[in-house]
Swiss-Prot record:
Family as reported in the entry's similarity comment: Belongs to the ycf70 family.
Location in the cell: Plastid, Chloroplast
Keywords, alphabetical: Chloroplast, Plastid
Chief subcellular location: plastid
GO cellular component: chloroplast
InterPro entries per the UniProt record, alphabetical: Ycf70-like
Originating species: Zea mays
Name this polypeptide is given: Uncharacterized protein ycf70
Keyword Chloroplast: yes
Origin: domain of life: Eukaryota
Length: 69
């Protein structure tokens, strides 16, 4: 179970840095400094919240696995 939690943490970090790289490439290609969604929220910020909750959930799994030992 610990290996699964570590796998999810690394997966979340990879997705975060990949989305950050893609967003920075879009900004360079478009020449705009800020890209906003229709609702006015920055896409990178909304992705960051999702990744934060996924990593938090993975850490909860890791800590619950340690308590069961």
């Amino acid at each position: 179970m610990v290996l699964y939690a570590l796998f999810y943490v690394f997966l979340v970090l990879f997705i975060f840095f990949d989305s950050f790289k893609q967003e920075s490439n879009k900004l360079e290609l478009s020449g705009k400094e800020e890209r906003k969604l229709g609702n006015g929220e920055d896409r990178l910020t909304s992705d960051s919240y999702l990744l934060f909750f996924l990593s938090y959930y993975s850490l909860l799994l890791l800590s619950s696995d340690r308590r069961s030992l």
